[in-house]
Structures are given as structure tokens and as C-alpha cells.
From Swiss-Prot:
GO terms for molecular function: 15-hydroxyprostaglandin dehydrogenase (NAD+) activity; identical protein binding; NAD binding; NAD+ binding; prostaglandin E receptor activity. It comes from Mus musculus. One of its GO terms (cellular component) is basolateral plasma membrane. One of its GO terms (biological process) is response to estradiol. This is 15-hydroxyprostaglandin dehydrogenase [NAD(+)]. SUPFAM superfamilies: NAD(P)-binding Rossmann-fold domains.
Amino acid sequence: MHVNGKVALVTGAAQGIGKAFAEALLLHGAKVALVDWNLEAGVKCKAALDEQFEPQKTLFVQCDVADQKQLRDTFRKVVDHFGRLDILVNNAGVNNEKNWEQTLQINLVSVISGTYLGLDYMSKQNGGEGGIIINMSSLAGLMPVAQQPVYCASKHGIIGFTRSAAMAANLMKSGVRLNVICPGFVDTPILESIEKEENMGQYIEYKDQIKAMMKFYGVLHPSTIANGLINLIEDDALNGAIMKITASKGIHFQDYDISPLLVKAPLTS
């Protein structure tokens, strides 16, 4: 899929990786709906992007992705405004081991909800023109992390769900591809959460171990993750792919023994 002329919806778009995604999509000619719960950050993000791009290229919608009604209304607003939806990036996420129910709701349940809403609008069975859904996971979705078990569980869930949904989308001839990005540590505000007891709870005493891991593995710039996003969108052969991005190896893919139904599925026109 060529990004130019397409309409994208990015959750968690006001800062960090989400903002980098929005910038990359705009640079490649897309129109972008910036979805975020943080009103102040969202308004600032749109204002900054308006200085680089035509204001009509972006739309900011305040939304708590954990609220099902707000999320449904947001998708409707975006499609009503731009007339279509081609690219969905479920990026919003938190790190909170203390309020673990919230972590699962935002990191996993909202991704599942967003994916199904995206399919409702993009699937050819529903009159859509196909498209692509990118769900944000993490390297923590591919390995155990003693200091963040709930965050780890949420990111594992994203991978299992997305790979399965990608197979289903192919079987249904929906015209929609689904892929996952699993970055390592990224220089975003979420890294600050490891310093806070209100986020880490009983695991706060292990924050120095996480810092040591960051030093060992390195910290990525959000623009590197955005490059991976564009690659996943533009390569029509990728469906159910798990893209890993690390400081040492850059962009590469997780290998699985998978069904032929999942590989090289030409789902979009």
C-alpha cells in the first residue's frame, strides 16, 4: 500500500512513538487523525504539525481508548471527517503494574476493540476498500519480564490476537492486513513510569534492574520505530508479521513456524 493519499488513525498520537508515527505518515502524504486522551498534549501536537503540514491534513480527537463508547464515536468522527479509513495504528499504551486492570484494559482490550472497529470500516465485506492495522506490542511481548509481569502479559496478548486476527482476515478475504511492531526501549515519556511507585507498585524496588537493562540494550529514537511502521504499510506481502526493532539489530522479524495461510497474503488492491 502506498501511504500517499491515505487516511490514518493513530491512538496515543500526542507524544512519543505515536507523534513520530503521525509525522512519518504526514511526510508520506497521508491524512492523520490524532487520537489521545490528553487534551493539552493533543492540541499542542496538532499545532506543531500544523506548522509543518497543511492544517486540514490532521484532526485531533480527544478519546480515552479504554472507554468503548468514546472509541466507537472516535472512529465514526474520523470517517465522517475524512470520508474513509485506510490505516489504523493501535499505539496507546501504559505501564502500570499497580493498577493492573487498567493496564490490561488500555494495552490489550482497547487494541482488540480498535482492531474490530477498524475491520468494521475497512473490510471489503462491509463495503470498505481494505487497509492495514498495525498493533503496537514490545519485546516484552516475546519474553518474560520479572519486573513488569502485567505489562508483559498485555504485550504477549497483542501478538497472539493480531496473528490470529490476521489469519481470520485472510480467510474472510477482508482486504485488511494486520501486523505487529515490537520495539525495545524507546525514548518516550513511558520510560519515566519505572521511577514511580504509583506505576510500578511492588516492583519499584527493581527499578535499577530495568535501568541496567536499558543501558545494556540501548534506547531507540521514536523515528526509528516510525520507519518500521512505513515499511509494514508499504510491503503488501506482510500479514501477521511481528517486526522487532532493537538498537543492536535495527528492524528485523520474529520467525515462527506458521500456517501458509499467514504468509504472503495479497490482501489489498
